[in-house]
Amino acid sequence: MLPRTARVLGTGRFGTAVTEFLAFGLKQAYACIFGGTLLAAILLTRFVYPDDAVLTRYDFLFLFAVAVQLCMLATRLESINEAKIILIFHVVGTAMEIFKTAAGSWVYPEESFFRIGNVPLFTGFMYASVGSYLARVSRIFHFAYSRYPPLWTTYLFSLAIYVNFFAHHFVIDIRIGLFALLFLLYGRTWVYYSVYRYRHRMPLVLGFFLVALFIWIAENIGTFARAWHYPDQAEEWSLVSLSKLNAWVLLMIISFVLVTLVNRPGKEPGTGGKDRASPGE
């Protein structure tokens, strides 16, 4: 499809830009297969799932997500390494869900059999879909970096973010300090990526914010579908506060660093400077 489109549009500036844009969109859609499928199921079951079904809606979503995951592995749409990342996200995400629902940060209002405490198990797949997207987008766009911070600093930073998600309920919230560290660590980092014919680059911090924005949009779809709700949405649905974006940006850091545990960030050739992501630094 793309080669034919590229021939039709030609190699001029406009034709090249349109081809790159189309290729970018198709690759992004491919990277979002798991998350997009799960989100579509959440939205669809809100309106068509029978109230008197033997299997509850949440349990259906859990079994559906498992089936989709197995199909993606069987058809090699997802690699074993990406499956490892998804498993890590399940553990990290479910642990946070158990704590946050107990603290009343948000609520899953429906019944289910497959659950831990107040948390239906399909929720782990929502976190896993972020991990799946990041792992897949890194692979199909051939991500590489310049001025990437030492790996050990990113591990400590993501740990501090994760701890703060719990600790701010009991002690002072250090979120402002974490954002300062975000720009200190990643402010000079560029991510390089291939779309179709050309190599492009973007500030990595901008990438974090853009992905967080789309997660916020997906969160609005999820709450609209009553898969969960925040306290101010108990009576009727409303847009999720834009203030949640800062939490999603920080969660993006954790997600991104978890992916680097399996797929080590590579250095973009020809960018100069020392590869600061080398082991042992």
PLM segments and residue spans:
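Aromatic-rich, lipid-facing transmembrane alpha helices and their immediate juxtamembrane interface loops
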Residues: 1-281
